[in-house]
Amino acid sequence: MEAYEDIKLIACDMDGTLLDEHSQVPPETFDLVRALDGAGIRFVAASGRRYDTLRTFFEPVADRMDFVASNGAQVFVRGKLVDREVFSHAALRRLYALVNEFDNLHMVVYDRTNSYLLDDPACFDAEFDKDLPNPVVLRDLPSPDTSIVKVSISCDSAQMDMAYILSRELEADFVFAPSGVKWIDVMQRGVNKATGINQVLAAHGVAAENVMAFGDSMNDYEILRMVGHSCAMGNGRWAVKQISKRIIGKNTEQAVQAELRAVVESRAIGHHAFETE
């Protein structure tokens, strides 16, 4: 049985992890976040999604948690921005040129408010509900004075092969991590969820060994490697399961919520911790 007594912070991925099969936050989650906060355990959403999208998901409890967004490029602690890593325009130009060599790749770049689709919108329709807010169709990269905080590539086929090819070509600039069914997350080298979480830990004075983390995809790899209590989803990628200390149920079974409930109950605060607002 898992020992929860030393946990001081919980970091959780969103898609394929905390969200249900309809890409929604199960309602019980909000009471669990309140209960964790009441027990002195900080909850952190750690996702490839942008901060504005994450905050909307957690609006009822957003002021009682922290956010590592855009795969570590946006870090918010106690409601304040503590770090933002902007992509180099020159590096993006190299990536865009490479993506254009492959018919099965379609690139999206994001600033704080918009999603810039650098291909025919029809290429993205299959997962158009996957964090593409305020879409703007462009035929080239936005201007260099646009602060790009996130980059994703939609892949029609051979996702793992394409991630390998992109890495071979541009490994000095980026890290490429397969995510979801057909996406490849593009991260600046040296920037990932783990680097973002490290900033949150420093702000709260928490050690990595006192962190529980949940994830399912390769963009969760570094953080699961780092923490004391790593939990891979039953629906997660094989490599993520291999390096995690535990494998729990699937997101469709609300397995994360069950684990959060167990943490709350381990603090002997029972149902009294579950506030309602």
Can you name each region flagged by the protein language model?
Residues 2-9, 26, 186-277:
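Mg2+-dependent phosphoryl-transfer enzymes with acidic/Ser/Thr/Gly-rich catalytic loops
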Residues 6-22:
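Asp-based phosphoryl-transfer active-site loop
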Residues 22-124:
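Active-site phosphate-binding/coordination module
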Residues 29, 54-58, 163, 240, ...:
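Hydrophobic packing residues within well-ordered alpha-helices of enzyme cores
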Residues 35, 97-98, 166-168, 239:
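Alpha-helical scaffold elements within enzyme catalytic domains, especially in hydrolases
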Residues 38-44, 63-65, 149-150, 209-210, ...:
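Short active-site oxyanion
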Residues 103-214, 218-226, 235:
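Conserved acidic, metal-coordinating active-site core of Asp-based
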